[in-house]
């Protein structure tokens, strides 16, 4: 136990090993012998299969939820139950039904639902601490920008069986979209805007609700895929006239963003059909983005874009 400030109360620090034990033994139900027989790498992979990120990541998140200065994210002492916290992370990773959660965690549907959303909302609120727009930029080329579409249940429309505002051209189904921006030179998500209906393409979102005006105001530029063509003052896209070095730079930058998108889609709540409300989608998407930001900070840094000889 570690004593924090008076406002934060007594902080319950858990090591990655303790987090893993709670997850595998007390929640998932692995026997002590099975855990001991396996290598640490195997147990970490088991844990990630149920909770989405490693014990080291969740140990850091758990500590920050108690120490953060973000009031909306701070968990008061009476609510600091690591089992409930991991139950919420399991919801993000495996997206179980309430019946499945009730059986797995031996908790009533009502209490399971309440504690899941409580901790998901707390992790989501850490975005104010983890998803940060820098005060200044070191280079005019600052970030990549991309829209991430997720499949959601079909929204009711008063006339048609399908609402065209929600139609995702990526999935051919109803969807919601977030605009994400990632620093070109750091493992850092710098902006997360949404959710938007997927009827509007990424380019339209960018100029009407997204980052374009902020980029212009700061005098910086982004790199985007071909869907952002036509906004040369704020975003650069792949161009047949690019030199070999510039072409490689843009390609690696976009693949780097795809790497982060892939981390997020590793969570079943975002990779399959989302069956809850739009508000709950916002909770889940932003919480997962925060968790993935911890991942790239702690153990999975995004690769460097610039390689030797790129601009020779």
Q: Residue locations for each model-derived region?
A:
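Short, well-ordered secondary-structure "scaffold" segments embedded in the functional core
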Residues: 1, 5, 79-84, 95-312
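Short helix-to-turn junction characteristic of helix-turn-helix DNA-binding domains
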Residues: 90-91
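Charged, often Cys/His-bearing segments associated with DNA-binding zinc-finger transcription factors
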Residues: 1-76
């Amino acid at each position: 136990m570690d004593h924090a400030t008076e406002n934060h109360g007594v902080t319950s620090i858990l090591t990655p090993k303790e987090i893993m034990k709670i997850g595998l033994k007390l929640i998932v139900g692995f026997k002590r012998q099975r855990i001991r027989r396996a290598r640490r790498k195997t147990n970490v992979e088991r844990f990630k299969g149920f909770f989405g990120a490693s014990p080291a990541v969740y140990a850091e998140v758990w500590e920050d939820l108690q120490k953060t200065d973000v009031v909306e994210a701070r968990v008061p002492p009476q609510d600091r139950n690591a089992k409930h916290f991991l139950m919420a992370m399991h919801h993000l990773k495996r997206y179980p039904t309430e019946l499945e959660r009730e059986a797995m965690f031996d908790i009533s549907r009502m209490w399971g639902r309440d504690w899941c959303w409580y901790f998901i909302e707390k992790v989501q609120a850490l975005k104010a601490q983890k998803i940060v727009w820098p005060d200044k930029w070191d280079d005019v080329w600052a970030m990549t920008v991309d829209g991430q579409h997720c499949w959601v249940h079909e929204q009711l429309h008063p006339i048609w069986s399908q609402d065209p505002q929600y139609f995702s051209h990526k999935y051919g189904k109803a969807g919601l979209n977030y605009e994400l921006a990632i620093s070109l030179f750091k493992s850092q998500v710098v902006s997360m805007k949404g959710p938007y209906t997927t009827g509007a393409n990424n380019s339209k979102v960018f100029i009407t609700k997204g980052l374009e005006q902020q980029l212009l105001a700061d005098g910086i530029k982004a790199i985007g895929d071909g869907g952002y063509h036509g906004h040369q003052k704020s975003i650069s896209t792949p161009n047949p006239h690019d030199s070999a070095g510039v072409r490689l730079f843009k390609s690696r930058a976009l693949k780097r963003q795809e790497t982060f998108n892939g981390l997020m889609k590793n969570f079943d709540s975002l990779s399959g059909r989302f069956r809850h409300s739009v508000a709950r989608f916002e909770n889940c998407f932003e919480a997962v983005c925060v968790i993935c930001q911890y991942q790239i900070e702690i153990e999975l840094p995004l690769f460097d874009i610039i390689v030797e000889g790129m601009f020779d």
